[in-house]
């Protein structure tokens, strides 16, 4: 049978012995049947989607199996994990179903951030309710109900426990830093973000989980959950893209290739290739738009959603009438290559 994914992780457990987060440095997409069959008797895997606790001795055995099946990175990690002080867990996903455990959820998020699957490339239904709300501290992740006691213990021991954030999703770079990217403020890119090679995320840029860029992009605005930005597109400073989580929306908002969402602009419908939304203009799916011909004459008045995915369009607000207009985009967007030299 075809398996979806697997990965060995070091995990953090709370005082109830429940896993609250897991670090998969070498996730494997579409593992071979032979690899799963060799891992199964060691880990006690039977069938379906399982998260299995692994001992140090088992980890050493797993290392040999990974090596025998040409999974060098996983073999090296499993070999080191044989001396780990942290709990270990092996997750095997026979099928791509909604995650049933924290470990499964973390594996799926890391599949995206490792660029093994694209946003919407794996089922994440229910993950928000599955994950724990965690205090991410200088001493690692702490389950929120345990934070106050840990702070007291640290102070009495002469230490200060610093809380960087309280969230269900950690920052991506604590788990993986994909090749060829720059992130000015790492706290603004969540685990589960897909950051394409050549992407720069500036200080005010933000990328949520199950969202991101596919290639070279300059991100100075907000890419909400579920949003995908195509290669060569630019998200201007303070710009906002509506996510599928907002208002229970079902439409997947996306931006095609070589498009520009201007500074402080907003988008609530799928934009095609080589499109421009002028600075300060927020276009939602229901916005009424005047379409113009090449001579500036009105052709029709439509809702923006009717122009979803159409390429080579310029959206602007008429400064005299206040009406939103759409016409052919005559200037292609080109990102400044100098800004991406060090990626």
Swiss-Prot record:
Succinyl-CoA binds at residues 222, 237, 240, 263, 278-279, 286, 303, 316-319. GO terms for biological process: diaminopimelate biosynthetic process; lysine biosynthetic process via diaminopimelate. SUPFAM superfamilies: Trimeric LpxA-like enzymes. The keyword Chloroplast does not apply. Disulfide bonds: none annotated. It is found in: Cytoplasm. It comes from the Bacteria. Transmembrane segments: none annotated. One of its GO terms (cellular component) is cytoplasm. Keywords: Acyltransferase, Amino-acid biosynthesis, Cytoplasm, Diaminopimelate biosynthesis, Lysine biosynthesis, Magnesium, Metal-binding, Transferase. Gene3D superfamilies: 3.30.70.2010, Hexapeptide repeat proteins, Trimeric LpxA-like enzymes. The active site is at residue 220. Pfam families: Hexapep_2, THDPS_M, THDPS_N. Mg(2+) binds at residue 204. GO terms for molecular function: 2,3,4,5-tetrahydropyridine-2,6-dicarboxylate N-succinyltransferase activity; magnesium ion binding. Catalyzes the conversion of the cyclic tetrahydrodipicolinate (THDP) into the acyclic N-succinyl-L-2-amino-6-oxopimelate using succinyl-CoA. Belongs to the type 2 tetrahydrodipicolinate N-succinyltransferase family. This is 2,3,4,5-tetrahydropyridine-2,6-dicarboxylate N-succinyltransferase.
């Amino acid at each position: 049978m075809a398996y979806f994914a697997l990965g060995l992780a070091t995990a953090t457990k709370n005082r109830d012995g429940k896993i609250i987060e897991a670090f998969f440095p070498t996730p494997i997409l579409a593992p071979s049947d032979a690899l799963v069959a060799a891992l199964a008797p060691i880990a006690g895997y039977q069938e379906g989607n399982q998260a299995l606790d692994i001992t140090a001795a088992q980890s050493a055995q797993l290392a040999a199996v990974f090596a025998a099946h040409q999974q060098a990175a996983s073999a090296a990690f499993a070999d080191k994990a044989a001396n780990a002080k942290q709990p270990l867990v092996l997750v095997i996903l026979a099928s791509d179903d909604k995650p049933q455990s924290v470990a499964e959820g973390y594996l799926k998020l890391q599949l995206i951030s490792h660029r093994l699957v694209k946003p919407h490339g794996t089922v994440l239904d229910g993950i928000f309710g599955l994950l724990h709300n965690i205090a991410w501290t200088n001493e690692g992740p702490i389950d929120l109900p345990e934070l106050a006691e840990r702070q007291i213990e640290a102070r009495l021991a002469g230490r200060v426990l610093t809380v960087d954030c309280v969230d269900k999703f950690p920052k991506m770079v604590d788990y993986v830093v994909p090749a060829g990217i720059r992130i000015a403020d790492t706290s603004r890119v969540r685990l589960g973000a897909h950051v394409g090679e050549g992407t720069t995320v500036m200080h005010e840029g933000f990328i949520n989980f199950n969202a991101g860029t596919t290639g070279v992009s300059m991100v100075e605005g907000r890419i909400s959950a579920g949003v995908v930005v195509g290669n060569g597109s630019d998200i201007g400073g303070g710009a906002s893209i509506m996510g599928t989580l907002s208002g229970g929306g079902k439409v997947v908002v996306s931006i095609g290739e070589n498009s520009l969402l201007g500074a402080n602009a907003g988008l609530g419908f799928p934009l095609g290739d080589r499109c421009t939304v002028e600075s300060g203009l927020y276009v939602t799916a229901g916005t009424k738009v005047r379409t113009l011909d090449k001579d500036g004459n009105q052709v029709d008045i439509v809702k923006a959603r009717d122009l979803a995915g159409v390429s080579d369009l310029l959206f602007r607000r008429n400064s005299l009438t206040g009406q939103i207009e759409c016409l052919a985009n005559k200037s292609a967007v080109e990102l400044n290559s100098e800004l991406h030299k060090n990626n």
